[in-house]
Regions:
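Exposed beta-sheet edge and beta->alpha loop/turn motif
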Residues: 89-135
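C-terminal motif of bacterial Sec signal peptides marking the signal peptidase cleavage site
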Residues: 17-20
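Short N-terminal leader segment in a subset of presequences, especially plant chloroplast
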Residues: 10-11, 63
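Bacterial signal peptide processing site
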Residues: 22-24
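Short, aromatic-enriched amphipathic alpha-helices that serve as compact interaction elements
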Residues: 26-44
Length: 135
């Protein structure tokens, strides 16, 4: 019985460790997922901007401008957002990913959105070059 418990504890510890490690930022998919986490889940535009170039960076800059003066911090009621990867098209220099997000508010309402994330390989690694949202 003690051996089984040790195995379960080790498996749980390993799972928690792997979850805490985050995404592999050396891959296009890892960068796309990190961007989605910061932009849509955590609503941290400054962090999301770190993973962008080109059109994506201009869009984030505009979102920052439009939301200036609106404090989003630990006290802000944020929706619960879960997402899944639906499709991916990966290449050596450019890749695209389609995610579906489920957004749930505290009042029990929910809706889904699809996020298309385009990435490209830059001299400093993979970056999000464009993103769009649809119903």
């Amino acid at each position: 019985m003690k051996i089984k418990l040790k195995i379960v504890v080790r498996a749980v510890a390993l799972a928690l460790f792997l979850t805490a490690c985050g995404h592999d930022l050396n891959t296009a998919q890892g960068v796309a997922e990190e961007f989605v986490d910061h932009h849509y889940v955590k609503i941290d535009l400054q962090k999301a901007k770190q993973f962008t170039v080109s059109v994506a960076q201009a869009k984030i800059d505009e979102e920052i401008r439009l939301t200036s003066g609106q404090t989003i911090d630990a006290s802000t009621q944020k929706p619960r957002v879960n997402y899944a990867l639906l499709e991916k098209n990966e290449g050596e220099q450019r890749s695209t990913y389609l995610f579906e997000g489920k957004i749930q508010s505290d009042d029990g309402t929910s809706f889904t959105r699809k996020w298309s994330i385009a990435t490209r390989k830059e001299s400093n690694g993979w970056r999000v070059s464009n993103f769009t949202e649809s119903e």
